[in-house]
């Protein structure tokens, strides 16, 4: 419809929602009816936000009822490649959460970089995982990548390790995205489930210990594809696959990206020297109304 998407986590409360609403100047909201209270409290402090529609709402003004009353026709908007598609907010681990701005071309770029070069999905794959869609790791892995390659995705409202393994068994999942802590827990549970349909397992969001990599490979027969990504870059830009996978090592810059460790003057440092990771590629890095950045 031509709008800009700003996704939020279900765990966010009034204070965090108010900050996001004001920073992004959100004008329209879709909200789960179960979470309506926190958004309503934030809306009272956010004059830019006009209409809110709730889904999972049985009432006549709920999203489902409104959709049922609409005609089948739809007039789509054709955006330019440098039109803003979404604003993703960082987790705020280094201070106040920052809004990162991504174009329509960025959305396509992440689909044609990591999955095409490293994950290599097929149209008969079924994706699933634990990261929420408001986390760009989940947005790519559970929505954008399956759509780009004509595959399918299973979206679960809750996805602790045991339920993810149950979903693999029940739905014959072939690709999963989750965090190292989940793989560690699933390694101890895997023998209780039929996970023979699994082909690819992707990890990001935190360091993948070599012990976790080994435990999961012993339990499943699958080497975890580890990756480094960021909200600013939209998805994974360093990874490895196949014979290049080594326990404890994340990998190399994927095709389309360049990465090096530099000093404070942006000069490359010698191997083994601590520095800053500099990354360049088709995505990132635009902050929303942030002069410091």
Tell me the role of every PLM-derived stretch.
Residues 1, 108-126, 133-175, 189:
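Conserved AMP-binding/adenylation subdomain of ANL enzymes
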Residues 2, 92-93, 150, 205, ...:
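Conserved G/P- and acidic residue-centered "switch" motifs that form tight phosphate/ATP-binding loops
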Residues 3-66, 172:
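Structural core segment of the AMP-binding/adenylate-forming
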Residues 32-34, 56, 158, 180-181, ...:
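Short secondary-structure boundary segments
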Residues 54, 59, 70-89, 96, ...:
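Conserved pre-ATP/AMP-binding loop-to-beta segment of ANL
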Residues 85-109, 251:
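Conserved AMP-binding A3 loop
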Residues 148, 173-178, 187-246, 258:
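Gly/Ser/Thr-rich phosphate-binding loop
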Residues 252-256, 267-293:
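Conserved ATP/PPi-binding loop(s) of AMP-dependent carboxylate-activating enzymes
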